[in-house]
Amino acid sequence: KTYPYINVTVGEAFPRIMLVRSMKKDKAKYFGPYTSSQSVRDIIDLSQKIYKIRSCNRSLPKETGNYRPCLYYHMGQCQAPCQGYISQEEYHENVRQMLHFLGGNFEPVIQMLTDKMYAASEKMDFEKAASYRDLLNSVKQIDQKQKITSSEMDDKDVIAFARDKDEAVVQVFFVRHGRLIGR
């Protein structure tokens, strides 16, 4: 097995997000490599819940309206571009925000989820507030896992090298906005 990557198919009319094991020369954006495939799945699940990015393999917009909306639409985790329920411009704005999030910029998401949680609780919609709280905790958990100690908030690629007389090892770390996002 090889290390997992997050693939966002930005070359498609309605991009998808998925876990892949290798990078290809295509129009997709890749994040990684990551050491834990479970972490990648958690990040993908969280991204789909927050930004409602599709996970189906339908060829859009060619197949728009040919099928019923999937279960993810009914669970509120997809905006059903397969049915034309969201415009391509709105969908691309969600993808742009998700790419920002995947790049390590968590603050706007934390603020948005906090605001929605408080608004839902003021409307006495405690189930919705609890779901926003859970999403908020997931984002904070990912944020904490990716903290590094650097006073500079620059983007860096760090290469570490160690050897002894028989072996050598090289490790590459990707730092974005002062956070370790991959290695």
Residue ranges and their predicted role:
Residues K1-R183:
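Acidic, glycine-enriched active-site microenvironments
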